[in-house]
Every structure is written in C-alpha cells, then in structure tokens.
Regions:
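Intrinsically disordered, low-complexity acidic regions enriched in Pro/Ser/Thr
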Residues: 1-167
Length: 167
C-alpha cells in the first residue's frame, strides 16, 4: 500500500525508473490523497511464460476493473529498462538528478529498489511512495489510464499487454 495521505501526495510520476524527470514520463496532477493499493495482473503468454500484464495503483475507497475498462487514456510512457514506476513526484525527483550538466539517477536507490526487487519478483513498493514493476515483454511504449472521481485521480494503470495482444 502506498500511503499518499501521510506524505501529502497530490501528484504522481509514471515513468521508467531509469529515466530522469524530463524524459518520456507522464506526470499526473490532482491525485486524491489517501491510501493506494498497488496491484499487478500477471498471465501466462505461451513460450514467454508468466508476464506482468498491467500494473496499477488504486485509492482504497474505490474499485475498477483491470485493463483500461472505464479508464481515460492519459497518454503513453516509454520503457528502456524493462521496468515501470508509479511514484510520488517529489520522491521520484529526489532520486533523479536533473540539470543541464548532469542527468543521472541515484544508483544506490536504483540498485535497492529496481534491480534487487522489481527484476527478481516482478514488483516492489519503495518507501510507501512508489510502486515499481517489471514491464510485460520488456521495452516499448505503453498506455497509461487514469480513473477519476469528482475531478481527482483515484487510480492509475499502465497496460503492458492488452487482452487482444497475441504475442
């Protein structure tokens, strides 16, 4: 569970965790504060084996169906590391150096939260401020869906493999 209320989170970053905060991301504003469940959907895909089909965060006061049923297509995000994250923006920015001369991420954070966990067991919750998952078949462009209530986002989903994909 991500506890957005304790930290006053109202913005989230949807991004490959190896990207700086200026590259191929989707920054979402007006996110409802509160507790969020972190969810992944896995399925078996032939010779590929079991893969993460989608990842999502969902406010504990709400429900929605996986795989963009009723969600708003809010854009796409790129993956180059085989992983995806949904994180508090301030938490994400803290671990990603972003200026003209330097563009790098906090290697200790990356190794602890991405390499050691997400790559080994398909997902990881980082300090209750971020959710990291492996990304289906790996690198590519993926759809981001949002679910709203009274003008505030209460759910975010990244779909790596749709039900129609037959890879």
């Amino acid at each position: 569970t991500i506890n957005a209320e304790d930290y006053g989170v109202t913005e989230v970053m949807v991004s490959d965790p190896c990207y700086d905060s200026d590259s191929f991301y989707n920054r979402l504003y007006e996110v409802l504060s509160g507790n969020y469940n972190c969810l992944i959907r896995k399925n078996k895909f032939g010779n590929w084996g079991v893969r993460v089909q989608s990842m999502a965060i969902l406010h504990t006061d709400f429900e929605f169906d996986f795989l963009n049923k009723g969600g708003y297509l809010n854009g796409q995000v790129a993956v180059d590391s085989g992983t995806m994250s949904i994180c508090d923006c301030a938490y994400y920015d803290k671990h990603h150096i972003n200026d003209k001369d330097e563009n790098e991420l906090d290697e200790e954070w990356y190794n602890k939260n991405v390499c050691a966990w997400a790559c080994r067991k398909n997902y990881h919750i980082a300090n209750k401020l971020g959710f990291i998952s492996s990304s289906g078949f790996g690198d590519g462009m993926y759809d981001v869906y949002t679910y709203s209530h009274n003008g505030e986002i209460v759910g975010v989903e990244v779909v790596f493999i749709s039900d129609e994909d037959d890879e």
